[in-house]
From Swiss-Prot:
Gene: AIM4
Cell location: Cytoplasm
Highest classification ranks of the organism: Eukaryota, Fungi, Dikarya, Ascomycota, Saccharomycotina
The name this protein goes by in its record: Altered inheritance of mitochondria protein 4
Record's compositionally biased regions (Basic and acidic residues): 8-20, 27-45
One Pfam family hit: NpwBP
Protein species of origin: Candida glabrata (strain ATCC 2001 / BCRC 20586 / JCM 3761 / NBRC 0622 / NRRL Y-65 / CBS 138)
Length: 132
């Protein structure tokens, strides 16, 4: 039997609450029936939670397999200047680093950095140009 601080127990049939005194002062059959209903309700809730967890884990496994295979494809690994990893100096082929999937460059959602570096060093402020 599930007791709470304010002496109220949930009635699974009515989706409401009943005072505990009605069950405690009632006969044994009635209290046994309420206990069985509550335990079956809890079992159903646990089964639903387990099913949701199993579906989530299956979905995550499936998506992990899809992303890992997508990153190993030759077509998506080297995109050249169309890659977000493309840089004419250090990555002219536009290859993705190990463990990352290569994504085509989209100027609307991604902005490439310029060669100029901005730094703020104590009293020095402004743009510093480094030799290439």
């Amino acid at each position: 039997m599930v007791h709470s601080d304010n002496n109220i127990i949930k009635d699974p049939k009515r989706n409401g609450e009943k005072p505990v005194e009605m069950i405690l002062n009632g006969n044994r059959k009635e209290s046994k029936r309420y206990n069985e209903q509550l335990s079956s309700l809890e079992e159903r809730k646990q089964k639903k939670k387990l099913k949701v967890v199993q579906e989530d884990s299956a979905y995550m496994d499936q998506s992990a397999n899809q992303t890992s295979s997508a990153g190993l494809d030759k077509d998506t690994n080297e995109l050249g200047p169309k890659s977000i990893f493309y840089d004419p100096d250090w990555n002219p082929k536009g290859e993705a680093p190990d463990g990352f999937r290569n994504v085509p460059y989209n100027p609307k959602t991604f902005k490439r950095l310029h060669n100029q570096i901005e730094e703020d060093l104590g009293s020095l402020s402004g743009k510093l140009k480094y030799p290439e």
